[in-house]
Amino acid sequence: MSAGSSCSQTPSRAIPTRRVALGDGVQLPPGDYSTTPGGTLFSTTPGGTRIIYDRKFLMECRNSPVAKTPPKDLPTIPGVTSPTSDEPPMQASQSHLHSSPEDKRAGGEESQFEMDI
């Protein structure tokens, strides 16, 4: 930068705001404190930095090709990052859906694990 350059200031403008009158707080359940009716999410970091995610931006990120591709150099963990080698993934997920009444104990108690003695 040269010593002879001048800086021009832009005029300040007010930030547009909108006030919404809420009744007794019933309109906002506890999970919706950081969202707006338009779908914008906002939060702050422990350092005080404000983070605002617009709904349109989040939807674009969700539908982007980058979000649909798996990360590179992902380790192979059977059953977590890849299907188990013993059974296909469809059979594994369906086996949990069809549990017989004999598997469950009376009174809602289920054993944490089984042990042969």
Swiss-Prot record:
Region entry Disordered, spans: 1-47, 64-117
Q: Which residues carry this modification: Phosphothreonine?
A: T36, T40, T45, T49, T69, T76
The UniProt entry, under InterPro entries, shows:
EIF4EBP (IPR008606)
Offer an example of a GO molecular function term for this protein: translation initiation factor binding
Where in the sequence does UniProt note compositional bias of the Basic and acidic residues kind?
A: 99-108
Q: Which domain of life is it from?
A: Eukaryota
**Per the UniProt entry, what species is this protein from, by scientific name?**
Rattus norvegicus
Protein name, UniProt field = Eukaryotic translation initiation factor 4E-binding protein 1
